[in-house]
């Protein structure tokens, strides 16, 4: 499948990912974006077949305002964004695609558990990254103490985090800046955005030692940019 990761911080940290391929509405396209997206998929498949690629992976492209696609790199492994692709994937009409399991299966020399013809997508997935950077200070990395971190559970929501939910957490100076990934599913882009904002509104984040304001700034940044998501 495809996903769009155009909304990033100045440090090139991806902040919002959308599947299938979408784009910020602030970009005014003068080309057929659906055609370009189809071409990108066709090019990627052709390259994979040409070199005999047999693994999970991501072909990363950048598209100019004229609609010219350029291949940037191939990540020959699973990526942290795999969850937003998996949440919209359906195999034989059923949910439950596990891309990490497929990565292991191919590494063992086993065939994939399904064929391309058996794969379809349903709905829209949005992934938010809560990152230890301060959007109000040029996305400068920050450390501090998180006193409380919680949200309202929902059947359309998955939150992955290493931050403890039952006791405070001190962000160290040597750390993975990704504090949490939130994956939201909706039947269409409008529902996905509505649910995404509902999740952000439900977040309870309290911090001390400088962590409080950056935490709130992160949520405000994600809220502001949720409105910029628009399907090709």
Which residues fall in each region the model found?
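ATP-dependent carboxylate activation and anion-phosphoryl transfer catalytic cores
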Residues: 1-232
């Amino acid at each position: 499948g495809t996903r769009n990761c155009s909304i990033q911080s100045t440090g090139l940290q991806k902040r919002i990912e959308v599947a299938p391929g979408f784009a910020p509405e602030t970009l005014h396209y003068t080309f057929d974006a659906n055609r370009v997206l189809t071409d990108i998929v066709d090019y990627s498949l052709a390259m994979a077949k040409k070199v005999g690629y047999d693994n999970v992976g991501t072909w990363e492209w950048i598209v100019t305002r004229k609609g010219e696609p350029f291949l940037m790199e191939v990540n020959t492994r699973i990526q942290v964004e795999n969850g937003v692709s998996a949440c919209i994937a359906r195999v034989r009409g059923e949910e439950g695609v596990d891309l990490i399991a497929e990565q292991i299966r191919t590494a063992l020399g086993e065939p994939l558990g399904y064929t391309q013809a058996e794969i379809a997508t349903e709905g829209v997935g949005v992934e938010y990254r809560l990152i230890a950077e301060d959007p109000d200070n040029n996305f400068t990395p920050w450390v501090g103490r998180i006193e409380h971190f919680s949200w309202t559970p929902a059947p359309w929501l998955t939150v992955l985090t290493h931050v403890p939910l039952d006791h405070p957490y001190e962000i160290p100076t040597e750390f993975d800046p990704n504090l949490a990934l939130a994956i939201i599913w909706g039947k269409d882009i409008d529902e996905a955005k509505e649910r995404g904002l509902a999740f952000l509104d439900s977040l309870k984040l309290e911090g001390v030692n400088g962590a409080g304001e950056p935490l709130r700034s992160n949520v405000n940044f994600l809220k502001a940019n949720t409105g910029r998501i628009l399907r090709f």
